Regions:
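Juxtamembrane/disordered regions of integral membrane proteins
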Residues: 2-195
Length: 195
């Protein structure tokens, strides 16, 4: 099912589209990730600290590390999504609705194959160990510790909310990719008008 990518922009143009679409989708959902904290009644940025603290960073630096990691991964997912879509005819984004649909599927795949294992088998155990260990490398304030323990307690909510946000991220990624790639596939014959 593979076909050759013979577009004039080539691979570099596809990578640029992937970076742009991934960054837009990642930034569009930034406030939604902060709403996880609001839903659990914990200080803003606590969810992002679950990435920074296991890396040995504390305080506001942990929030920044978490944010930068999310944005970087969003750009990488955008690149992988657009390269895959340009090389496999089945996934080629010839219309915006097809981009949204394939993006939503991509978001579900990213959640199940990347986020879920990393969150449950790597980040949460490291965070729990850091919080329970008296000789931790990271010094966590009592308020931060209480908020992080509340986040761990609400882990089921975090997982369901994250699943929804990953599908939404993928939909926005597909939407932006469809907008950016519209001219490239203008003359491609359509199946049932949108596919």
């Amino acid at each position: 099912m593979s076909s050759k990518n013979c577009e004039s922009e080539g691979l570099f143009g596809t990578i640029k589209v992937g970076i742009g679409a991934g960054l837009v989708a990642g930034c569009a959902l930034f406030s939604s990730f902060l709403s996880i904290d609001q839903q659990l009644n914990i200080p803003h940025g606590t969810f992002y600290k679950t990435i920074g603290i296991p890396m040995g960073v504390e305080g506001f630096g942990a929030v920044l590390i978490g944010l930068l990691m999310h944005i970087t991964v969003a750009a990488l997912i955008g690149i992988a999504f657009n390269i895959s879509a340009s090389y496999w005819r089945t996934f080629r984004i010839v219309t915006v609705p097809k981009g949204i649909l394939t993006g939503a599927v991509t978001g579900a795949i990213v959640f199940s194959l990347a986020f879920l294992p990393l969150h449950t088998m790597v980040m949460m155990p490291i965070l729990e160990t850091t919080l329970s260990s008296p000789d931790s490398v990271v010094s966590i304030l009592p308020e931060e510790k209480e908020a992080l323990l509340e986040l761990i307690k609400g882990n089921d909510f975090v997982l369901w909310y994250s699943a929804m946000l990953h599908v939404l991220f993928g939909s926005v990624l597909g939407l932006m990719s469809g907008f950016l790639l519209h001219d490239r596939y203008r003359n491609v014959p359509r199946i049932r008008s949108i596919w």
